Every structure is written in C-alpha cells, then in structure tokens.
C-alpha cells in the first residue's frame, strides 16, 4: 500500500507548476507563489480557504468558485511520476507483490492525478478515501486496499509521508510501515514507523525485499 501525494508523486512540485502558470495567466508576479504555498500546507488546507486568502490579496479577476476549480486543476493536471519511481513499482510487481495506491481526497481530483501520472497503468488497484466515505488513518481504508486485490493485511506494508494518516493507520493495524521523511524529523511520541526512507524508491525497495 502506497500513499499518492508527496509519496508516489511530488504533489507540491506539481501544484507549484500549476500555480505559477495561473499567476502568469492573470498577469501577476511569480513571487506570490511562495506565500500561497505556505497557506496551501502541502494540500491539507481546504481549497476554499486558500482561494479566499488569494482573493483577499490579489486581483485575479476570478470568482471564488472559479479559483477553487483552478486550484484543484493546478495539482491534478501537473501530476507526474518520476521514471525511477515507475521502475521501483515494476520491480516490486515483478517480484510478486501487489501494489495498491491508498490516498485521501475527493475522487475526481485523486483519480485525475493517478491517471495523469500514468499510475493507473502501473498499479494493481487504487483506493480513494472519497469513494468509501472515510479517510486514513481509519482501518476501513486499509482493509479496502487489501480487499481490492484479494489480499490480506497480514503480509502488507504501508508507505507514506504522513505520520498521522499513513503511519498511524498502519500502526493501529499492526502493519509494518515506511515513512518518507522529506527532510523532517519524526515527532509523534506514541508510535514510530518500521523504517524511515529518504526517497520513495528506497521505501518501495525496502518493503518489497523485507
């Protein structure tokens, strides 16, 4: 099981690419991207909140609804998969492992990212929380991932960048995990990942060979 945003794909890089194009289209300086990225908080700030902050400071010539739609498109339409990540997925599957994406978020945006990154052609299944009505770290998300490939959590691993979603969810179910640290230090006192990785390629290879 592998998380999508900022794990399989660099969601922040994709969002920034789209954001810069949006600012350029509206005739605004690229320097605004920095504070917008801060408000965005890796995609965890609700889109209406980001849109309101932008409209309060910038003359975008857009309605709030149109800006929300544009912000969703920024990350969805610029989702890209690194070749080395694709190769790691292929190695894991060639070794007999089933690879399932497990991602929080609305179905249209998340499935759009998966498709635009070409992941729909590489993985065995994808579970989007919006389709099942609950988010990671709730057990139902992980059980749905196992069921999607006719498997069991008994021999599963979870890979992700979020301590409070990916790693906590795995911990509660007794599933070993790999945390993609992205330059951060682990701070949760009550649980820890089984392994910490510098890159998603390292994470996939570790889980596949454990």
What are these regions (language model features)?
Residues 1-87:
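N-terminal helical cap/lid subdomain that shapes the substrate entry/recognition surface
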Residues 65, 86, 90, 94-210:
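Asp-based, Mg2+/Mn2+-dependent phosphohydrolase catalytic module
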């Amino acid at each position: 099981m592998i998380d999508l945003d900022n794990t399989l794909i660099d969601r922040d890089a994709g969002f920034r690419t789209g954001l810069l194009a949006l600012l350029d289209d509206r005739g605004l300086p690229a320097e605004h991207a920095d504070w917008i990225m801060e408000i965005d908080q890796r995609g965890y700030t609700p889109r209406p909140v980001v849109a309101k902050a932008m409209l309060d400071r910038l003359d975008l010539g857009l309605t709030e609804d149109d800006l929300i739609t544009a912000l969703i498109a920024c990350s969805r339409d610029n989702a890209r998969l690194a070749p080395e990540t694709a190769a790691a997925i292929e190695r894991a599957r060639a070794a007999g492992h089933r690879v399932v994406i497990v991602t929080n978020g609305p179905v249209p945006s998340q499935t759009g990212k998966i498709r635009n990154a070409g992941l729909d052609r590489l993985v065995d299944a994808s579970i989007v929380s919006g389709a099942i009505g609950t988010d990671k770290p709730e057990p139902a998300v992980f059980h749905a991932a196992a069921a999607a490939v006719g498997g069991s959590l008994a021999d599963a691993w979870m890979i992700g960048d979020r301590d409070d979603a990916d790693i906590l969810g795995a911990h509660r179910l007794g599933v070993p995990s790999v945390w993609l640290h992205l330059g951060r230090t682990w701070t949760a006192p009550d649980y820890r990942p089984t392994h910490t990785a510098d890159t998603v390629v390292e994470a996939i290879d570790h889980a596949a060979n454990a």
